[in-house]
A protein has these predicted regions:
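Family-specific signature for flavin-dependent thymidylate synthase
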Residues: 1-210
Length: 210
């Protein structure tokens, strides 16, 4: 059994300038004001759009991510149906080939609970391998014993309006800590690369707290 960490990676990231230009040109098309495009005008108009709730224009900017998370977190994230998802399938992936499963340690375990959790993970791994190796059942049946904290890779394609919505919901103190930690890393990444689109959210949630 391998313990892995949550992670967020941006796939084929567009430049900041490309996103700025796309959104500004779309917004200015509504008023035929393309002649007002200057150096620095894009950030100004995008900030105006966001501050005044005109979010449809930022839907023209989209991003693709590769994330590693536990299955329970993936179930929460895929509720955001304005995204496109490609999720590692436990029906077709055969973890017996590597001889072990990958898991993510849940947030909030104390020492005693960690020992119980670790023992349970080993039991689940053993049962899964036995069902495939000895009982000769297909992976779609053996997966029934896999844990919720099984590490899974998820590709996510999302426009920036929906991404902002996800960040606000999943960084709220009422969200489960496991998804908050993952989405905090996501916020740090996108704010660092595309600041004007996320500066208001970063101002509120830029530092994670329990």
């Amino acid at each position: 059994m391998i313990r892995v960490k949550k992670s967020v990676e941006l796939i084929n990231p567009p430049s900041y300038g490309e996103l700025l230009s796309t959104v500004e040109r779309a917004a200015r098309n509504c008023y035929q004001s393309e002649n007002k495009i200057t150096d620095g005008s894009a950030e100004k108009i995008i900030r105006f759009l966001i501050n005044n709730g005109h979010f449809s224009m930022i839907e023209f900017a989209d991003l693709t991510f590769k994330m590693v998370m536990d299955r329970a977190t993936a179930m929460q994230l895929t509720r955001h149906r304005l995204c496109t998802f490609a999720i590692e399938s436990t029906r077709y992936c055969n973890y017996n080939k590597s001889g072990e499963i990958k898991v993510i340690v849940p947030e909030g375990l104390n020492d005693s609970a960690y020992d119980t959790w670790y023992t349970s993970m080993l039991m689940a791994e053993t049962a899964y391998m036995k069902m495939i190796q000895e009982d000769k059942v297909p992976t779609e049946v053996a997966r029934s014993v896999l844990p919720q904290c099984l590490a899974t890779t998820v590709f996510i394609h999302v426009n920036i309006r929906e991404l902002r919505h996800i960040l606000k919901l999943r960084l709220d103190k009422h969200a489960q800590k496991d998804i908050r930690v993952l989405v905090q890393e996501l916020l740090e990444l996108v704010y660092g690369m595309y600041p004007v689109f996320f500066e208001d959210i970063y101002e509120e949630y830029g530092e994670y707290s329990d």
